[in-house]
Amino acid sequence: MNLPITNHDLSSEASAKAESPITPASPLTGSCPLPISDYREIVLAHGSGGKLSQQLIQKIVVPQFRNELLEPLHDGAIFSLNGARLAFSTDSFVVSPIFFPGGDIGKLAVHGTVNDLSMCGARPLYLSAGFILEEGTSMEDFWRIVLSMREAAAEAGVTLVTGDTKVVDRGKADKIFINTSGIGVVPDGVDIAPGRARVGDKVIVSGEIAVHGMAIMSVREGLEFETEIASDTAPLNRLVESILAAAPDVHVLRDPTRGGITSALTEIAQTAKVGIRLDEVQIPISEEVKGACEILGLDPLYVANEGKLLAIVPAESANAALTAMRTHPLGSKAAVIGEVVADHPEFVTMRTRVGGTRVVDMLSGEQLPRIC
């Protein structure tokens, strides 16, 4: 299948520079690598997890810090220290509202970093937390969020060991922002990275998509449904342990948060230089979420998830991985939704319900700002 479409992988220019050794940063005397005529300021879409996020990272951030640990652009850095393989990750959370059906910003902050470590195949151990508080924020709200973080950490089996707190003037933040970082141990024999997807691999999703994003949007828009849409935020480390026990040769794991499953799979396709073909009929989505997306004019393929994962697994291990998922409470609705193909490298296509084929690319704009 030939796709006369521009390749949106922006890493080629930066990759050319990677051959030279790392040197101290020089003064920034050149021009900004993103055309000022396009964006003179940061816009919300730069945080969407789509094309503008990718441009921001690949064009401005990565070239200044390029190194072998950063290069894979994984959910975390994986490195060896005194004989142990460790994973290190960080994430920031600005979700609005800070309390929502199924969770709050504190629970999300713990789960998010636990899950990023888990997508590296690591067993999460320790977290840090940084709080940016707006003057005037309710002390009761802050207390509830801290208690929620404690409960989430206990559920995930991790310990919060260090942190920081800052307070800014009224109007200089929106109640509370949280950053969490984490470290975990990668077991021997586990080798998971976005560049390891291979032709013939199966693509599995652990459950119904787009739940978290629509839980947030339902609150924002005041939508009421017969069954409340609650966020799927959850720690995925135990699920990952079950998957790896059944299928230790898993190639890729990814939690499809901002930008949804489409953005996550496009990043994998670009990194591994492969194509990915999805089957729309096989993608699990609840009727409530589907209805909410239709009301708001949103495509669920691009809506954030916080308690789901994508696994790319060799075909011979797919049944074992799928069975392991379905026997775990967080993977009971897991499904094989596609495969890795040699056609259309670096692109994701989807066979539609009516039998056609369409390209599903990253969004350029912002569907859902401040979703996590």
What is each PLM-predicted segment?
Residues 2-13, 18-372:
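Helix-biased detector of long, well-ordered alpha-helical tracts
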